[in-house]
Amino acid sequence: MKIGITGASGFIGKRLVKKLEEDGFEVFKFVRRDVQNENEIFWSPSKQEIDIEKFQTLDAIIHLAGESLAPKDIFGFLPLSGGRWNKEKKSRIYWSRKWGSDLFVKTYNESDIYPKIFITASGTTIYGDHGDEVITESTTKFNRGTFDQLVAEEAWESPLSGIKHKDVRIVKARNCLLYTSDAADDDHC
């Protein structure tokens, strides 16, 4: 099975690539720079460009790409990347997700050959605060109008309803923030 992954160099992506390769999957990394080997696929979400020929060879896509949510450590001893969530940071968080989702919808709709599985990252914040209640896919989404909920709903998930091909299985992997204590990891969040 050929799987394309956006965000392959990120916190989740690099671990997922390693595991998928160990399990025998053929992994292709979407990159925004010049392609350096046969297992890379060029894409530019901000310019709405993608190598459609390589896209059409994939069986599945896992879409993880987006601006890091992690704050910078203002004290200088936590190796986190990112920055405070000021207006500019929020814009990068939102648009880095929205452009990618929009590009995939456009590419699917312009293609007669396409991956039949599309897995997108999203956030558990889409549900709002339910206290101690166990959250499932059927849990009511609270519309709090907060930025984190806006990103999950409008940037990650809603655009995907525009994919016209009804035989594409769309999976929404709603994650919370993840951390590691691995000191060798340069991206702790």
Region roles according to the model:
Residues P45-L103:
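NAD(P)H-binding glycine-rich loop region in Rossmannoid oxidoreductase-like domains
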Residues E88-S91, W95, S101-G145:
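Conserved Rossmann-fold NAD(P)-dependent oxidoreductase catalytic core, especially the SDR/UDP-sugar
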Residues F30-D34:
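N-terminal Rossmann-fold cofactor-binding loop
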Residues I3-E21:
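N-terminal Rossmann NAD(P)H-binding glycine-rich loop of SDR-like oxidoreductase domains
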Residues I117, S122, S158-S181:
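Conserved beta-loop-beta element that borders a ligand/cofactor-binding pocket
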Residues G66-E67, T124, D186:
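Flexible cofactor-recognition loop at the NAD(P)H-binding site
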Residues N37-K47:
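Rossmann-fold cofactor-recognition segment
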Residues Y179-C189:
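Single conserved hydrophobic/aromatic residue that forms the stacking wall/gate
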